[in-house]
Structures are given as structure tokens and as C-alpha cells.
């Protein structure tokens, strides 16, 4: 079974205008050992250029590197895997593009979706939003820690909790059953993203 670092750091500049590669470097400097590249809107050339810049940084630091939504770009840059949304390609199709030995994770928002993703062979399921988030244009209703507990009861694969998680709430989310906590805004909007990573890791190990 896949072993995930406790912090799942998402590289998305949001409204900061920080270059993705610079953000990635800062997160890695703080101790992040898993990065997912997420750009909205996902313009292909921009996503490819950012992925090409970040993958060597991640691998030099001994970190896993995933690309959001796009298994083709993940394959092109030899990323460690891809993260799929509910409207993206099925797990099996993504695996055909990526080849063997790559990670495929899936976003889920309820127990049924999580069970379906695990049954389809996802290496991990992301569940959320746990808390209110400002990182999505049209956020769903927060589901709270109960969603983590419920999904933990029906899947054997690792669970990544996402949505409005902060350094203060991350330990609670882990205690509810999440193997990892995914964070965007609390890291990339911080004045010092590296320090923000260190603060999170100090609480969750």
C-alpha cells in the first residue's frame, strides 16, 4: 500500500501571483515531501512548463510530485503520478496513459464516491471539503471530520483530507483518520511558505 507523507502540499499560486516553481522551492525548503501542481485555469502550456520546472526540484529533495487533472502532462514530465477529480478520466484510463508504477489519486466528496474510487484502484482518496475553503471558485458545503471518519470505515487505501485545513486543525484531521492533510491557501498565501510548512509539520509529524 502507498505510504504518503503527512503533509500533502498543493502548489497553486491562487491570488498571490507567485511563480509556481518558486512556491514549490519554498514548500520543499520547509520540509514538504509531496507536491501536487494545480493551476486554475489549467492552460496546457503553462501547466507543462511549471511541471517541467518543479519535477526536478521535487525529486532532488526526495519528494513525490503529482500533477492535478492531467495524466498526459504527468506522463510527459515523468511525474510520480496524477490527481483526478470526479469529472476527470477514470482511474484505469489514467493508468494506461501513465504506465506502471505511477500514483493515481481521486478527489471524493462523500462515502459512496470514496468507495467507488478505492474499488476502481485509486492509490489514495482525497476527501473534503472538511472545512470552509477559499481555494475553490465554487466550493462545496464543508463536511467536517465526520466525513473522514466515515470514509476511514469503508476504504483500506490512504485518505488525504482537504478543504480549509490549517496548522491548528491539521492534528484534529489526522486524529480523525486521515493519513495526510492537503493544504493550499494556508501555505501559499503565507508570508513565508517554508515557515508555514514547518509549523504544520511540527503539529502532525
Language model segments and positions:
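Conserved N-terminal beta1-alpha1 strand-loop-helix module at the mouth
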Residues: 1-88, 96-124, 140-146, 150-159, ...
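A short, flexible beta-alpha/helix-coil linker loop
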Residues: 131-133
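Glycine/threonine-rich flexible loop motifs
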Residues: 135-137
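C-terminal binding/interaction regions
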Residues: 176, 180-183
Amino acid at each position: 500500500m502507498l505510504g504518503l507523507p503527512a503533509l500533502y502540499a498543493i502548489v497553486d499560486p491562487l491570488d498571490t501571483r507567485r511563480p509556481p516553481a518558486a512556491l514549490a522551492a519554498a514548500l520543499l525548503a520547509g520540509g514538504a515531501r509531496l507536491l501536487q501542481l494545480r493551476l486554475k485555469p489549467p492552460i496546457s502550456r503553462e501547466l507543462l512548463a511549471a511541471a517541467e520546472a518543479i519535477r526536478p526540484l521535487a525529486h532532488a529533495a526526495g519528494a513525490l510530485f503529482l500533477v492535478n487533472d492531467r495524466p498526459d502532462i504527468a506522463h510527459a514530465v515523468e511525474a510520480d503520478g496524477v490527481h483526478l477529480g470526479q469529472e476527470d478520466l477514470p482511474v484505469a484510463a489514467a493508468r494506461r496513459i501513465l504506465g506502471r508504477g505511477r500514483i493515481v489519486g481521486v478527489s471524493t466528496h462523500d462515502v459512496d464516491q470514496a468507495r467507488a474510487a478505492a474499488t476502481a484502484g485509486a492509490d489514495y482518496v482525497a476527501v473534503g471539503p472538511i472545512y470552509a475553503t477559499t481555494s475553490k471558485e465554487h466550493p462545496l458545503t464543508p463536511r467536517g471530520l465526520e466525513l473522514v471518519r466515515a470514509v476511514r470505515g469503508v476504504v483500506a487505501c490512504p485518505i488525504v483530507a482537504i478543504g480549509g485545513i490549517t496548522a491548528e486543525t491539521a492534528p484534529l484531521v489526522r486524529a480523525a483518520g486521515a493519513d495526510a492533510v492537503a493544504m493550499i491557501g494556508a501555505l501559499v498565501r503565507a508570508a513565508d511558505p517554508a515557515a508555514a510548512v514547518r509549523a504544520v509539520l511540527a503539529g502532525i509529524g
